[in-house]
Amino acid sequence: MTPIVKQFKYGQHTVTLETGAIARQATAAVMASMDDTTVFVTVVAKKEVNEGQDFFPLTVDYQERTYAAGRIPGGFFKREGRPSEGETLIARLIDRPVRPLFPEGFFNEIQVIATVVSVNPQISPDLVAMIGASAALSLSGVPFNGPIGAARVGFIDNQFVLNPTTSEQRLSRLDLVVAGTDKAVLMVESEADILTEEQMLAAVVFGHEQQQVVIENIKEFVKEAGKPRWDWVAPEPNTDLINKVKALAEARLGDAYRITEKQARYEQIDAIKADVIAQLTAEDETISSGKIVDIITALESQIVRSRIIAGEPRIDGRTVDTVRALDICTGVLPRTHGSALFTRGETQALAVATLGTERDAQIIDELTGEKSDRFLFHYNFPPYSVGETGRIGSPKRREIGHGRLAKRGVLAVMPTAEEFPYVVRVVSEITESNGSSSMASVCGASLALMDAGVPIKAAVAGIAMGLVKEEEKFVVLSDILGDEDHLGDMDFKVAGTREGVTALQMDIKIEGITPEIMRIALNQAKGARMHILGVMEQAIPAPRSEISDFAPRIHTMKIDPKKIKDVIGKGGATIRALTEETGTSIDIDDDGTVKIAATDNNAAKRVMERIEEIVAEVEVNAIYKGKVTRVVDFGAFVSILGGKEGLVHISQITDARVERVADYLSVGQDVQVKVVEIERQGRIRLTMKDLNGDATAREVVEEIQELAE
C-alpha cells in the first residue's frame, strides 16, 4: 500500500497530490493538500450507461468535516447535516469548469466527492478541492479532456497576488477564481471593489498563466499513477434519422425562430416537436422520441447561430448590442422598507430591501469559527416565472449561486456599519424570466436599496452577455435571452457602477476564446451597463434621504464600557425591563456603543434618557428624583439615577423627630433627595431635609394621602 506522491510549488504555497493508499475501490482518489489544508477527492464512474439515459449525469458534492478544524459540530445531533450555502457554492465552482470537458454523447454516470479533512485557517479549501478534482478525474481514465488548473487572484497595492492567504485577502480589492486548461480559460468567478474592465481582464490572464504549473504537474502525476484510458468511442450519428427530422422540421423551425414573443415561439416549437415525433414513431416504433428531440435541439442551435454569424437580427429582432426595453418602478410595496420592480424585456425582478438590527445579522458557522454577515441577499426563482408548474421549497443550487452572484455585484457599494448601523436583507423574486435574471436582481437590488434610504456609494447595474464563434468569426451579444444562453459558446455576466466592475462571472464552452475577444466583449458589456444605469438614475437618482416610516430607527450613543454591566443589570433584568417598557430593541457592543432600534422616536428618546441616568456618576450635594424601594426601622432605601440605591437615615427624613419611618415614607413613593456622602465602599448616604420648602415630610405624605382619597 505504497502511495504515489507528487509535490510542487505553486506561488508561495506547496501543493501535494497523493493517491493509491485510501479509497482504493473508487475509480480514482486523490488526497490534495496545500499548506496543511487537505481535501480528499474521489471519483466513481459507471462503466455502463443507464438504460434510456440521454444526458450526462455528473454530480459534484463538496463537504466540510468539522474535525478538519479540530471542532465538534453544534446542534442536538452533533454531526454534519445538509450542505451549507458555502458548500453548495464550492460544489458549483468545481462542477462548472469540468463539465464542458466531457465529450458530447458521453452519458456514463460520474460522481465527484470532495471532503475537507484538514484545514489551515490561512488557506481556503475551495482551490485545493478544484485541483484535487482535476487530478482525480485525470487519473480515473474516463474520457475527460483535462486536466484543469485553478487560481485565486487578489489585487493588493495595485499588484496582482497569486493565491493570497485569508489574511492577505482582507486587504485585497479583488477576489477572483479562474479555472482553465493549458489552452483556454473555462470559468471565472469574482467580486471586486470597483476595478476597471482592463484590470479584470488582466487578472484573468494572470491567473490562467500562473495555473499552468498545476496542469503540468497533474499531467506528470497521471503518467506515473493514472489508470488506462477508457476505450470509449462517441456513438455514430444516425444520419438517416437526422435527414428525416431535418426534412420535416428545419423549415418550420426557421419560421418559428422569427416569432419574437417567447411563449408564442415555444408553443410553435413544441407543436413542431410533437408533430415530428408522431410522424416518425408511426413509421418506426423503435425510434426514441428523446433522439428526435436531441436532433431538433441541434437544428435549433444551428439556425440561431448561423443567423447571428450572418449578421441577421436576433431571435427577438434586436441587433447584437441592443438592450431590451426597460421599465422601472420604485416603492411598489407600501409597507416594506424599500422595493422596486425591474423589467427588462421578458425578464422581471421584484426586489425588496428590509432593514434590521444587529441581532438580525446571520451567524455563519464556518470551519474556522463563527462569523457574522450584515448583508443578506436571497434570490427566488418560482416555476411560474417561466410559465411552468413545479416544487416550492428550500432553494436549489442554482438559486443559491445566482443569489451569491447578485450579492457580489452589490457588496462593493454597501455602506459600512459605522456609516449605516443596520443589517440589510434584499430578496429578489423573479416574476418573469427570459435570460439574465441574476443581473436583473442586481439592478432591482440597487433600486430597492436606494428606495429604502440605504446610502449606497453608487447605483449598480448588471448585464448578461453571450458570444457565438464559428472558426475565425465571432459575434458578441448584449443582454442575452434564455435561448441565446443555451446556444452560445460563452456567457458572462458583468455587474458594476459607472466607475468600474463589482462582479464578473464567465463560463466558456469552447477553446479559442482569446484575451482580445474577452476584451471586446467586456467593452461591449460596459456600454450596455452605462445605458441601464442611465435609465435607473432617471427612476431614482440618489438614495432617499429618510428611511421608511415602517423601518426601525437606530439611535446610537456611547457609554463607558465599564458601565455596560449596569445597563444590562443582574441577569439582564435592567435591559429586559427597558425593552419591554418601551418596545425597543437594544444592542450593546463591547466598546460601549449602544444601538437603540425603535419605530417610535419618543420611545428611543426615553431609553436614551434612562441609560444616561444609569451610567451617570452620582455627585455629592446633587439633588435627584428618587423612588422609595424599601422601608426599614432605621430609614428608607431610595433608588436614584436608574437603579443606584442610597439610604435616607431616619434622622435625615425631616427636621422633626421621626418615631416610625412608615409614617413618613412608603414603598413606591417618589421623593427628592440630596447626596450627602459617597462612602469608600460605594454606599450612598442621602437626605430629604429642606427639599420640600417649609413643609415637613410628614405634611407632604398627608397631602398625598388626601389627594389619593
Curated annotation (Swiss-Prot):
EC number: 2.7.7.8
The keyword Cytoplasm appears for this protein: yes
GO MF term list: 3'-5'-RNA exonuclease activity; magnesium ion binding; polyribonucleotide nucleotidyltransferase activity; RNA binding
Domain KH: 552-611
Known cofactor(s): Mg(2+)
Positions of the S1 motif domain: 621-689
Protein family (similarity comment): Belongs to the polyribonucleotide nucleotidyltransferase family.
Protein name: Polyribonucleotide nucleotidyltransferase
